[in-house]
Amino acid sequence: IGKVAAATTTTVLLTEMACQQIIFTGVAGGLGADVRVGDVVVADALLQHDMDASPLFPRYELPGLGVSRLHPPADLTARVVGAVREALSPHALSVNGPLRDVHLATLGLSQPRVHQGLIASGDQFVSAAADCDTLRHHLPGVLAVEMEGAAVAQVCHDFGVPYVVLRTISDRADESAHIDF
């Protein structure tokens, strides 16, 4: 868990295992108004919400890179979004027949959806409504918050390796996040 661990692991995958691309998955807290527990968010941009080297650099800017948001390759992102949409389609999920709806209802979930947008990463487990409001205020349009994706993106960017980050929403990053997670 955390940006350093994710960056270290990604570096090993790229240098020792010669991975040609990285598809990074996991869970995140949902921040977007329409993002629900069980939904999947595929990043079209990643940002370290706890990066602040001001006054030397603007808040969120990655020193040495001159950018605050990292963008996965659009073609790879589009392929992953398509694959997730297919996997979450009612037809694909109907493999379990009527039991699928029972399982979703038991967990208090509805039909999962896929979203595409900004994922914010930081070395903290966000579990307070006030922190969510702060993130939404400073990062309009942010869909999810987690602890590793932007670090993986930065390492892949530095090595010139294509990547995509997708997260299943496990909680709403609020006061019950530690239970829902």
Question: Language-model features: where?
Answer:
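Short glycine-rich, acidic/polar surface loops and turns
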Residues: 146-162
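Regulatory input/activation interfaces that engage signals or partners
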Residues: 159, 163, 169-181
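Short gly/pro/ser/thr-enriched loop/turn and capping motifs at secondary-structure boundaries
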Residues: 3, 30-31, 48-50, 172-174
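Proline-aspartate-enriched helix->loop->beta-strand connector
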Residues: 19-23
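Short loop/turn motifs at secondary-structure junctions
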Residues: 18, 36, 115, 141, ...
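N-terminal short beta-loop-beta anion/metal-coordinating cradle
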Residues: 1-18, 48
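Mid-sequence, gly/pro-rich, charge-dense loop/helix-turn segments that line enzyme active sites
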Residues: 31-139
